[in-house]
Amino acid sequence: MWHSELLCHHLALSILPLSRARSAQAKDERNIMSDEATYVPPRVWSWSAGNGGKFAHINRPTAGARQEHDLPRGAHPLQLYSLATPNGVKVTVMLEELLAEGYHGAEYDAWLIDIQTGDQFGSGFVAINPNSKIPALLDVSGADPIRVFESGAILLYLAEKFDRFLPSLQQPALRAECLSWLFWQMSSAPYLGGGFGHFYAYAPQKWQYPIDRYAMEVKRQLDVLDQRLADRRFLCDDNYTIADIAIFPWYGALVLGELYGAAEFLDVASYRHVMRWAQEIVARPAVQRGRRVNRSWGPEELRVPERHSAADIS
């Protein structure tokens, strides 16, 4: 009997430090949450002008045009209305890649949409994209103009229109792989941009919980890419496709230290396969040109606010 009591006593002593550690950790977490969880949601949410942090002056909980404003139109078959954010860069890179391969039907006019001043809420832009987000494309090469909005939809539209940068229907497995990675980017990037990027770089205050939560998810995504690229040149084996064109402006720019000033925080150098892939893509001449189009900030030599011919990108 006394052996059992002694064993229980020793077991309790061995568990005690772990229990105390867990208790201390729980206390720390409660302290963090008590500092941050001061907001009590009302029964029904209502908008105020201060909602939205850095972008509060343009964010609203309603859709539709806020002002009458027609969009300009140039002479080329494709009219792009955009800005050189990651989503905008996807499309200009795609167009520059097509032009580099001699697809003259991909000639385009790129018009600047200044999202800080609300250009995306003009009636002309909303007529092309009712969601008021860049990029938006108008194909005027046929009898009736075709509108395309959402960056992934534009990439897919252009890939099918020119039969380039997307495996053919005769390669169903490779095509499915490419489309899977394209839509992986569409579903994953909001955690990087609207989640991590917002709370790390743009929110009015620094809150640990959302930064930790989204940093964990972004690092998981980087690991997904790193494992995928460990034994292949591009996302779809040796084929440079719209999957790479879609993913690079977000995750390539991130590991190259160009997004949110978060390279060290996220230890991006540890994702060496993603880094190798990003460095190869950023060296492509068409990528370098596409990244400059609709850019209205940064060094003057990198800015090409509007593009109407190849001569605009010196």
For each predicted feature, which ranges?
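GST-like fold's C-terminal all-alpha helical module
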Residues: 34-40, 173, 180-283
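Short, flexible helix/strand-to-coil boundary loops that buttress conserved ligand/catalytic motifs
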Residues: 169, 193, 258, 291-294
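GST-like domain detector, emphasizing the conserved glutathione-binding G-site
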Residues: 28-212, 219
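A contiguous, mid-protein "functional segment" used to position or interact
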Residues: 88-92, 269-295
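Ala/Thr-enriched low-complexity intrinsically disordered regions
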Residues: 12, 21-26
